[in-house]
């Protein structure tokens, strides 16, 4: 079961203190985490939302190996990443209408692509990344929110890097001007 931990704040974002272990370290991608949950807080466009218990510290139980045999067990069945794609001014198949998101039933997918292209650039004094890939016969170019991949690689200030077999956690974001944007929340490069 996939969950999206949320807070009781109006935007439901987690504070740095709420999303770290007792030693103040934030979880890494592939960490297996135990956390306190108070109640299911679904939205029609994000049904995986669960309210965390802010009084309980998160605990790392272990880390999954970044190996195909392990990761493939968690891959979502191959299908398009939500029906009714449309393109924004910066992306390809990177958004769906709020109505389509509400009909989808899920807002988190863990997928595997054979090849992806990561583009990193400095925009208004902050690093922004997008990732382009093909999945289920559809081309995508999505914004990346994984902090590990929102920084320059190899000292370049603007880079386009080809990634081989890659696992992506794709999420539908909050509604914005009638659309929910598809975001890549985590990237795992397979060995």
Regions of interest found by a model, annotated:
Residues 1-31, 35:
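N-terminal ordered "arm"
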Residues 24-27, 119-124:
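Exposed beta-sheet edge/beta-hairpin loop segments within beta-rich domains
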Residues 26-31, 36-114, 127-191:
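OB-fold/S1-family single-stranded nucleic acid-binding modules
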């Amino acid at each position: 079961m996939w969950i999206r931990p949320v807070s009781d704040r109006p935007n439901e974002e987690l504070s740095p203190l709420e999303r770290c272990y007792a030693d103040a370290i934030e979880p890494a991608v592939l960490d297996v985490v135990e956390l306190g949950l108070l109640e299911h807080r679904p939205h029609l466009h994000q049904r995986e939302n669960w309210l965390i218990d802010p009084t309980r510290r998160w605990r790392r139980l272990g880390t999954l190996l970044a190996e195909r045999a392990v990761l493939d067990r968690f891959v979502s069945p191959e299908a398009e990443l939500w029906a009714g794609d449309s393109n924004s001014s910066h992306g390809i198949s990177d958004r769906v209408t709020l109505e389509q998101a509400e009909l989808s039933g899920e807002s988190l997918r863990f997928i595997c692509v054979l090849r992806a292209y990561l583009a990193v650039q400095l925009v208004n004094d902050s690093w922004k990344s997008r990732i382009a890939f093909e999945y289920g016969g559809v081309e995508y170019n999505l914004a990346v929110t994984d902090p590990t991949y929102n920084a320059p690689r190899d000292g370049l200030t603007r880079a386009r890097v080809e990634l081989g077999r890659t696992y992506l956690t794709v999420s539908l974001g909050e509604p914005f001007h009638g659309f929910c944007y598809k975001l890549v929340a985590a990237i795992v490069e397979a060995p």
